[in-house]
Amino acid sequence: EQDYHQFFDEWSDRDLSASVRRDRNHPSIIMWSIGNEVAQRADEPEGDLISKRLVGTIRKYDTSRFTTIGSNDFWDRRQFTWDKDSYRIFRNLDVAGYNYIWWKYESDHAAYPDRVIYGSESYPKEAAQNWNLVEKHPYVIGDFVWTAIDYLGEAGLAHALYLGEGEHNPQFMGWPWYNGWCGDIDLCGDKKPQSYYRDVLWRERPLTMAVHAPVPDNKKEVVNGWGWPNELVSWNWKGLEGQTLSVNVYSRSPKVRLYLNGKLIGEKETGKENYTATFEVPYE
C-alpha cells in the first residue's frame, strides 16, 4: 500500500530535484539515473513522456553530468524484442545501462555506433566476460556487479546448493538464509572469493587461489544466477586429510604451476575466457 508508484506522478519531480540539488557538488556523482528495470521503459507514449520529463528535471539543476538508466532485457514485456524496441529506452539519455546483457554490446554498437554503454548490473560468474569487453571497446565504459556488498532481503538469491537428481533449485531460500549473499563483500566487510577473483581481473593482484568445499556423493553443485561456487580462500580443511579437493587458481598469466608442500602438482593454462586453472589436489 505504500509503494512509491502510487505517489510517482505527484512527487517524482520534487524528489528528483531535491536529490540533484543535494548531491550535485559531490565529485563522486558521474551520472544521474532516472531508474532501474523500469516497466514502462519502452512503452509508447508513456515511457517516452516519463523519460523526457525526468531528464528535463535533472538538466534544470545540473547540466554537467550525463543521464542514464539501468535496463534489463524484455522478459517482462514479451511483446517487445531487444533488437527492435530497445532504442526507445535510451533515446532521451546520454549513456545506456545494460543489466545482464553484455552479449549485446558489440551488436548494439554496430546498430548504434554513437551509443555509450556500461554494465549497470552483472552476475559475479560473468565478471570476466563483462570486463574483457570493457577493456576491448572504448564505447563500453565500465561494469557494475550486483552487488558490491551483501544486503538484507532477497534471501539466498546467490545460493550454491548440492542437489540430487530431480531435486528443485529455488530462486530464493527460507530461514536461516536472510541476506541476498550475492555481494563481493559480506555484511562484516570481509572479501568473499569472487572479490579476490575480481582483483585479478582488475590487475590489482597477479594471482589468487581458492579451495572448493567437497561435493557429497550423488550430488552436484547448482549455482544460482547471482551466486558463486562454494569455495573458500582457505587452506584449513581439518578432517579431510587424504581427500582430493579442487583448487582454483585465478591469474592473468597464460600458465600457472601449482605446488603442494614443495612438490609440483601440475601446470595448466588459465585461458582468457575466465582466467582460471583448476587442479585436483589431495589435502595434506
Feature names for model-found ranges:
Residues 5-10, 40-43, 76, 123-128:
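Acidic-and-aromatic substrate-binding clefts and catalytic sites of carbohydrate-active enzymes
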Residues 43-44, 79-80, 154-158:
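Short acidic, glycine/serine/threonine-rich loops at helix termini
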Residues 16-45, 85, 89-95:
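Active-site groove signature of glycoside hydrolases
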Residues 3-6, 35-62, 83:
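Active-site cleft segment of glycoside hydrolase catalytic domains centered on the general acid/base Glu
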Residues 13, 76-81, 98:
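Short gly/ser/thr-rich secondary-structure transition/capping motifs
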Residues 1-27, 52, 60, 91:
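N-terminal catalytic cores of secreted or lumenal carbohydrate-active enzymes
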